[in-house]
């Protein structure tokens, strides 16, 4: 066999196998059979290829004739050859081959029709329903209320034994928890209710000694002390006694909040957390600082936060005392300043703040001013300094009536400036009235001949 024949035979085998493979039922669509009829299902419509086969006729050499062979007959295909003129004998061979192949195609069974998509979906639905029923039966079986398995005596006894075992474990756990709680309570009372002892180990007598319930009284007193530590100020006397002679003790005490009155906290991505100093703060401290007033910073901020801020802007030491959050009274979630613990005469104490809740224990001593939010064009401290200077110059024995009067306005410093301008205008008018009257008298005297009386 020549090389050309071998290559043609391999090529035909490859195409025949490919057609048979993709014509099988395994490659049918899941959506069902095609609506267009398959031309290869009808044996009468089979098309035949015409491979060329060499035939020896009357010893005249190789004569090529075309023999029609069904495409789907066998996996092997016949090699194709160029067509030549047909001989009468070739026609007989062709007719016989056609009859044989027609009989084979007619006797071969028709390909099975693949199931449709609706049938597959119905079967899938049936299988899912069966799985759901099986899962439901497994779930309801342990409950003991229904199911065929629970009707058996062995399963019922097992369920009852499990219930009794769980009940016993629950009872034992409750007893252990109750016993641990009792032991813990007794240990707590014994530790915190014991009497204090000195360095030698002797018992220190207190007001609860000799009582059968002394440990409980001591525990209640410990809770009270802890509450006072959190709620009440750190000490009963927040400021030391006034300066004795020959030192100069200012007559009036100014208690002022730090946050949003003198400085404003601000946080940015670039600078982080910092405090802005209010405009004219240095002038304000120069006016009200020692020896004019006894200035006390009383802030709700912690000492670690507020103390460095105060030291940064008070380099001249014009502020005498600093009180922080530990010196406030915690009431209803708010830090309240108790001025009665300042160890000063409240008739001469001026408390400046923007929050009315901070001075709710002593509202008559409070001068409420607007909150400063970092506006650098603000000049309220200048007006407030003039107001406090006026109070100092008035030398009043009780400043509370003046504070109550100005506290009725939203901005006391602004109202004071308005009244100061008004009084200055009134004084200017009073100064001008005597001059006008004297000029009128001199003019009228000259007019009516009374000059000699004026000269006399």
Swiss-Prot record:
Q: Name one GO cellular component term.
A: TIM23 mitochondrial import inner membrane translocase complex
- Where does the sequence pass through the membrane? 172-192
Asked whether the keyword 4Fe-4S is assigned, the reply is no
**Signal peptide: which range, if any?**
none
Q: Where is the transit peptide?
A: 1-22
Its membrane topology: Single-pass membrane protein
Chief localisation class: mitochondrion
**Ranges facing Mitochondrial matrix side:** 23-171
A biological process term (GO) from this entry: protein import into mitochondrial matrix
* Gene3D superfamilies on file: HAD superfamily/HAD-like
Q: Does the keyword Protein transport apply?
A: yes
Mitochondrial intermembrane compartment: which residues? 193-456
State the family it belongs to: Belongs to the TIM50 family.
Q: What does this protein do?
A: Essential component of the TIM23 complex, a complex that mediates the translocation of transit peptide-containing proteins across the mitochondrial inner membrane.
> What is the name of the protein in this document?
Mitochondrial import inner membrane translocase subunit TIM50
Organism for this UniProt entry? Caenorhabditis briggsae
